[in-house]
Regions:
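Acidic donor-binding/catalytic loop of UDP-sugar-dependent glycosyltransferases
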Residues: 82-95
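Glycine-rich, basic loop-to-helix element that forms the pyrophosphate-binding segment
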Residues: 53-70, 110
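Short beta-strand-to-loop acidic/aromatic patch adjacent to the donor-nucleotide binding site
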Residues: 73-84
Length: 212
């Protein structure tokens, strides 16, 4: 299995996630912190592949990078760094269909998910105009539903420290108060316009919504 995981801070929770993996896996860490990490883990089932970035790509761009790095997969498995898997979760996730988006059955539904190749072929990638976080999942789910493709809920028993990134950093929390509203408006404008497009990365939005 290949797991894609963006991370900005709380590398202790990333360690917990990696140590909870119970299948042979390569974990592709998209390190958005701008700082190289001396990462130690204790799981013989896991190989680590680090992508150290000079600045924060944001969630949508990180998910897209993970897909682009692995273009020959039939499904892409993506997880939050602050997730902890229960035994059997990843085996269940590995049953995800290649024509569907497979989410967790409990909120937050996108904490760990799979995107099938037929979805990416038909719907495209995540909207990188939504930076750095929030509403990229709502937008994609809406686009998938509009395309008539399945959205499946899997009964994963994992645990998740929701919003650990912003809750552990005062500056991130303050910036999120601004960028959340901006992304909310961006998403609402797409809905109002009946826009089901992939969207585009915008230099202006990237700079204005920066958490760097």
């Amino acid at each position: 299995m290949k797991l894609i995981v963006p991370v900005l801070n709380r590398f202790d929770l990333l360690t917990r996630m990696v140590n909870s993996v119970d299948v042979e896996a390569t974990v592709y860490v998209i390190n958005n912190s701008g700082v190289r990490q001396d990462f130690v883990y204790d799981n013989a089932l896991v190989n680590m592949h680090w992508v150290d970035l000079p600045s924060n790509l944001g969630v949508a761009s990180s998910w897209n990078l993970g897909i682009k790095m692995l273009p020959f997969e039939s499904r892409w498995f993506i997880t939050s760094a602050d997730t902890c898997f229960a035994p059997g979760d990843l085996s269940l996730l590995d049953s995800a269909r290649d024509d569907a988006v497979s989410l967790c059955s409990v909120f937050p539904y996108w904490q760990t998910f799979a995107v099938g190749q037929r979805v990416v072929e038909q719907v495209g990638l995540f909207d990188e105009g939504l930076h750095p976080i929030y509403f990229e999942d709502n937008d994609y789910e809406r686009r998938v539903a509009n395309a008539g493709l399945p959205i499946v809920k899997l009964d994963l028993a994992l645990t998740h420290d929701n919003s650990s990134t912003i809750n552990s950093n005062i500056r991130f929390g303050a910036r999120n108060n601004v960028t959340f509203v901006d992304n909310q408006k961006y998403f609402a404008d797409k809905v109002e316009a009946d826009n089901f497009g992939q969207g585009v990365w915008s230099l202006l939005r990237r700079r204005n919504n920066s958490w760097d």
